[in-house]
């Protein structure tokens, strides 16, 4: 299992940002913090590094998202940490 802590930067003027964040809130893999001034902290829990990367790439390509910044990543017992 992998756990990633990320900071998501949004374009507050883009109405699509709220839709993207609503999609994240509906996804049980994501735990979202407070959205303030276009910045949101979040935790992503996945079953693999591959799934983690796929989720982060998807998010980075969504409308209203300016950037996705990985703060910390840890992947279970396999010894792989960070990227």
Where are these regions (language model features)?
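Short amphipathic alpha-helices in soluble, non-transmembrane regions
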Residues: 19-27, 54-62
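A generic structural motif
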Residues: 38-45
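Short beta-strand
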Residues: 32-35
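Short glycine-/aliphatic-rich beta-strand segments at the starts of folded cytosolic domains
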Residues: 1-10
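Short loop/turn motifs enriched for small/polar and acidic residues
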Residues: 45, 71-73
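Short acidic amphipathic segments
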Residues: 30, 59-71
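Short, low-order "capping/linker" segments at domain edges
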Residues: 46-57, 77-83
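Generic alpha-helical secondary structure
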Residues: 13-21, 49-52
């Amino acid at each position: 299992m992998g756990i990633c802590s990320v900071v998501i930067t949004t374009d507050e003027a883009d109405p699509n940002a709220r839709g993207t964040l609503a999609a994240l809130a509906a996804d049980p893999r994501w735990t979202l913090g407070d959205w303030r001034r276009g910045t949101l902290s979040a935790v992503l829990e996945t079953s693999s590094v591959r799934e983690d990367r796929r989720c982060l790439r998807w998010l980075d390509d969504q409308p209203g998202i300016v950037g996705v910044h990985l703060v910390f990543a840890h992947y279970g017992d396999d010894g792989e940490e960070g990227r």
